[in-house]
A protein has these predicted regions:
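Bacterial Sec-dependent N-terminal signal peptides
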Residues: 1-38
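Conserved, structured core segments of small domains
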Residues: 36-167
């Protein structure tokens, strides 16, 4: 199919159709866009958070499951959960725990997660065993070494800024 060339275009040395021009511009803008360095890499921050060249580090991931203690009274559970929450705060304040939170009701008996700021199961066992609810077998812990973003180390700092203080 021949494209229509207008009379005034015949006398020019170079003619480019709109389709060709659009294609060339599209390719050109993409080459420029993809060649831009958009990295916000902050080596000092990566080092401070313990991150490697990918911004990642080793943690220990913990799933808390329903434990074997089925005889604790409501009052005992209340005291154990108060101790559980106090221990979470203590470990977070010491930067030994970077993420903690409960699971919603599920059929796997998963109750919550911890992500410990340590690199070995042995270190994490000591930390999780400092929890009164784990000691009383309300929870049991399943631990595994995990590789994740070093940015998790900033979770507490940010959480403190977005959670309202208790009255």
């Amino acid at each position: 199919m021949k494209s229509k060339i207008h009379e005034h275009q015949k006398n020019t040395k170079f003619y480019v159709s709109k389709k060709t021009l659009f294609t060339l511009l599209f390719i050109g803008f993409n080459l420029v866009g993809f060649s831009q360095d958009t990295s916000n890499y902050d080596e000092a921050l990566a080092k401070k958070l313990g991150g490697d060249e990918r911004g990642m580090k080793t943690y220990v991931f913990c799933i808390l499951k329903t434990g074997t203690n089925t005889t604790a009274t409501a009052e005992e559970k209340k005291v154990l959960f108060e101790g559980h929450m106090t221990n979470i705060k203590k470990l977070a304040d010491e930067n030994k725990l970077v993420v903690a939170g409960p699971f919603m009701k599920n059929d796997k008996n998963y109750r919550g997660i911890f992500i410990f700021n340590c690199t070995t199961i042995e270190e994490a066992e000591k930390l999780v065993n400092s929890d009164p609810a784990v000691q009383a077998k309300i929870f049991e812990a399943d631990l595994t070494v995990w590789y994740g973003s070093a940015a998790l180390g900033t979770t507490k700092e940010i959480h403190d800024k977005i959670s309202k203080p208790k009255k």
